């Protein structure tokens, strides 16, 4: 195995500084790996020229002893719904197949400014509507942990940010950016055995992120360790004058304590009982129970809590999602950008045809349903109702985090991320898109409802040799504690995200 | 509708069958005022009129995916100031909504507006209604809502190639939509409301009100009903391009509806366009299409809070309504009342002066610097002579090159009896055509001085008496009015320069009737 | 080396990867568990029998408003079932609960200074349009109802 892949970002940049490894060499190897692992279909587009140029610039800076910071020369991949100037950004849809943004998303420009090397754009479900990365113009993304990658017994990578998760899991890059609306970062992170962070809503800028549900979307971060995740977070977080939904408070960099400095005796862990829902696999349940136990052994107080409106979340999500989709997709008419059909008889005909040709079935159905809910006669009954239940869900969290009685409070919630390990593609594809999302997003959606931060960390492998992960959630802007606890758990379980490569020890 | 074309050939619609007093007309206005700001409502692109095609367009205005709105503080302040000046209640929290429909000049497929919770509500406007030939009266109209919203782009229709060309410079320009209650009854009332609104907005400097640039757009909702009945079906009239058109369009539409009903027809809820050239309203669509805008809260803009606390100051993100209310200048009605009180003007005079801000400025500055001239003389000259001249030439007062100093000089000379009123009127024309030459120079150049010399006048009078024997005879018989013919003759002989007062005195002396 | 790499990936793994000895025994717990060991049932009404009013006129209206066509019976069924899915929350008690439009409802909305900072980028603005004509966007004539 390539030795440097065992390093975390801090170790990598240290070796750059010492001249042991050059960013250029690393990038070349990464591009090589990407090509060799093409079967995963993690990337929709590699940008080798730009990447090598950035790597070259980084090398020069290290040679001059003037590196930009923690991410200088670090390889990153970006989900293809983030605008990258001059590089096609397609959302894996025919509608935007030829769209070349004239600007960079804030997340991308901050990464570039920090000297990161952007390898390319990663695969996703079309317009982020899915939980498998199977509904893409460019074909599905495969999970590197699959027992076999050929034939029909391969496993899904999860979605909708499957490409980004896959790229990090495969060791092609050190970190990747995804997006998370109902679990789209944590879900593939769970299946691919990497860390997936959904920060607090408003902590990261959405300027340049082509939206799915504006009131819930958050850029997500993939990495192979909590420490790497924090390095990326520190680079991209903070208010943005281009995005009115960013939190105005200036961002202070997180620094996580060393493992042996972490004291869990003051930490209160909550186990929300509703998260044990129908379909939770015995192995995930076992994992959940064990980690709760580990925390208790270390001195944390662990108790069961109740978030009574949890199960309503998928229904609320489906309504709000479809309504926002109906609205957000209204701009795709082929006039200013995007696929343009040939029927020029009237705007109505042109728009209708462009949209029929440019959108897949999933997108079209959501647009129709969303418009139905937004009709004046239906608005109160569906949309407003969903928003009221949304408040109930958010208040459930608030009640446990900020309960009036000190004794009733918890700091961190521990739950499963996905209900099972990664499903086989052929089983997953048999379900409707709605059922796919409904089942897999059960534990991840509520965090988006409330805007609170959540992180998925891989714990161990299942009997089938596939990653099993757990999720931690905390109150808004509490990433410091959330990631500290995550880091502690990570150290206890010692999960190796690149274990799948062990077989290739001799060849690499 | 052929019969209606025949009817249109006569300019006055016939209403033979309906006694007009049984029917009421109801008019409600919707005004879109473009806020005068340097940049757009949600993006940082410019707002200048006439910019090159698609150059005042930010990525957000073109709905490029991934772009987000950021609110312009100046627009919020302008909205609040306007709301306060119109007596509204400014809401502490207001929200933005998306209004969905498809059109080529609406790149997002929705307009960002405020429907559920607007910036301000419940205002009121009380304004004078000036109808030629009728006495001035005051009318009140309630302002239901003042909301901030985006303008759409412009599409030019190319009928030849069957396509539309779209320019997005206007897309995203900041608008205030003012929704008035259907409290008006006539076209004149509507025009008067808009005139008053323009005066207010210009004083606040929140809108240029240049209707020819589209900075102020007026749509009218019109219906008729018989006294005692509920409001009738209304039509919406759009495309009214000038203040004058407001009265014409609404009057036309009211009459059209009355006629339609008289002929047994029904009014349909439709949108009609004002055809200024042919002076009529035309249906815009032949089928009224069912529309549902599917309003939805704009998720990228959290609620807008403003500070209602008295005595507060504005901060970067929190605009203080109290601080803005101090900045509101004197409003037109207050000025009128002040003029009436301070200068003992008739209300009609005050209305005319306030209606023409430049005229008002002239009045105030001349009054101040020329205390010897009575106020009455000043405003009479300004209104009866200066304003009349401008109107005759179809000239806007602000476009006339004559300034206050010139008028002051004319009045000074007039008051000092150096020139007479005729000469003063001539000077207006001369000044307008020779903007660089001063009054004194013109008087000398064109020999406009009054003739006051007694000998000269006597000679002229004698000449006039000789020329008008018949009038002399009649006057001496006792018809005092016949004197004017002789006076007129003197004026003619003196090329309008004789001092009329002295002339009259002289003639009276010369023509003393022999017997009583 | 690269070819070997490819080969490895395309081979079926006859033997499982050498599993690292688990330091942790996931079957052994020290404390009584706080994790519920049986699923917590969530009671939601069965709405699959709900009558969904979707007459042809409503469908036409929806298609026109969305400018997306319901091109098959299956699409109509999906729409109906989505509506039934949404009906499942109707019974939840929400009197006196205000809608949560945004989690940032307490924050002051950011206000921008009135300065010209954008625009003047016509080339870029037009760059993604498939059809333009002398700096205009081009669109077919509008307000013509769709063919039924």
From Swiss-Prot, chain C:
Catalytic activity from the UniProt record: L-glutamyl-tRNA(Gln) + L-glutamine + ATP + H2O = L-glutaminyl-tRNA(Gln) + L-glutamate + ADP + phosphate + H(+)
UniProt KW keywords: ATP-binding, Ligase, Mitochondrion, Nucleotide-binding, Protein biosynthesis, Transit peptide
CC terms in the record's Gene Ontology section: glutamyl-tRNA(Gln) amidotransferase complex; mitochondrion
E.C. designation(s): 6.3.5.-
SUPFAM superfamilies, sorted: Glu-tRNAGln amidotransferase C subunit
Transit peptide extent on chain: 1-10
Gene Ontology molecular function, alphabetical: ATP binding; glutaminyl-tRNA synthase (glutamine-hydrolyzing) activity
Biological processes per GO annotation: glutaminyl-tRNAGln biosynthesis via transamidation; mitochondrial translation; regulation of translational fidelity
InterPro entries: Asp/Glu-ADT_sf_sub_c (IPR036113), GatC (IPR003837)
Subcellular location: Mitochondrion
Family to which this protein belongs: Belongs to the GatC family.
Function: Allows the formation of correctly charged Gln-tRNA(Gln) through the transamidation of misacylated Glu-tRNA(Gln) in the mitochondria. The reaction takes place in the presence of glutamine and ATP through an activated gamma-phospho-Glu-tRNA(Gln).
HAMAP family reported for this sequence: GatC (MF_00122)
Subunit structure: Subunit of the heterotrimeric GatCAB amidotransferase (AdT) complex, composed of A, B and C subunits.
Name of the protein in its database record: Glutamyl-tRNA(Gln) amidotransferase subunit C, mitochondrial
UniProt source species: Drosophila ananassae (Fruit fly)
UniProt lineage: Eukaryota, Metazoa, Ecdysozoa, Arthropoda, Hexapoda
